[in-house]
UniProtKB/Swiss-Prot annotation:
One of the primary rRNA binding proteins, it binds directly to 16S rRNA central domain where it helps coordinate assembly of the platform of the 30S subunit. InterPro entries: Ribosomal_uS8, Ribosomal_uS8_sf. Disulfide bonds: none annotated. This is Small ribosomal subunit protein uS8.
Length: 130
């Protein structure tokens, strides 16, 4: 069966692993976009580390969990968000202004919403984590 939304599958794998208290999990297939989302989550401290494993079938990521993920998810459809609209989407998906992070695909790469606001760019919403 074909996977329709690999980002949603990856986020649900991370959430399930965090909810069950696992130390690590396997996210597959290993795409570039999922790798960028994992990089952002690692920089923010939501995961400890991740490594790419080539298995000849699309690859996979081995993710070491830090136990800090309360909820994460994919935002579908991928709404376009301008700099002025960022606060609306924060209120919609995050529990508080200082807790959590929206992940946005911008013209300068994939980044968290705090970095996007600092750089003065908008983009498409990919997911959230807190």
């Amino acid at each position: 069966m074909a996977r329709l939304n690999t980002v949603a599958d990856a986020m649900s794998t991370l959430k399930n692993a965090s909810d069950t208290g696992r130390a690590e999990c396997i996210v597959q297939p290993a795409g570039r976009l999922i790798g960028e989302l994992l990089r952002i989550m690692k920089e923010a401290g939501y995961i400890k580390e991740y490594t790419r494993i080539e298995d000849g079938r699309g690859g996979q990521f081995k993710v070491v969990m830090s136990g800090l993920i309360n909820k994460c998810g994919c935002i579908s459809p991928r709404y376009s968000v301008s700099l002025d609209e960022m606060e609306y989407w924060e209120q919609l998906y995050l529990p508080s202004k200082n807790i959590g992070m929206l992940m946005i695909s911008t013209s300068k790469g994939v980044m968290g919403h705090h970095d996007a606001r600092r750089n003065g760019v908008g983009g498409e919403l990919l997911g959230y984590v807190y």
